């Protein structure tokens, strides 16, 4: 896979590289697509720290950690995704 599009057995793709930091959760939000359905995912700060222990503990640092580990994060998101489910999905340190 080229890294631009991740598609696994769960039929969800992550073609959109948009992501944002949500200080109310605190987590990085990103989106996946299953046909015409959009699913929201959040990866919390503890999970990002587990993946990249040297990440700066601020918005920029967490976004950079997400960008540097996008393929790993999207693979974990695909594992928790349930087709036809509504709502959002949370990735935590235990997912890594």
Task: Give the location of each predicted region.
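Short, charged/polar N-terminal "headpieces" of proteins
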Residues: 2-32
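Acidic, low-complexity intrinsically disordered segments
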Residues: 2-8, 54-96
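Flexible, active-site-adjacent loop/turn segments at secondary-structure boundaries
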Residues: 12, 19, 39, 46-49, ...
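A generic signature of intrinsically disordered, low-complexity regions enriched in glycine/proline
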Residues: 17, 26, 38, 71-75, ...
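A broad, structure-centric signal for solvent-exposed, well-ordered loop/edge residues
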Residues: 18-21, 37, 50, 55-58, ...
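A short, structured beta-strand/loop element
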Residues: 27-54
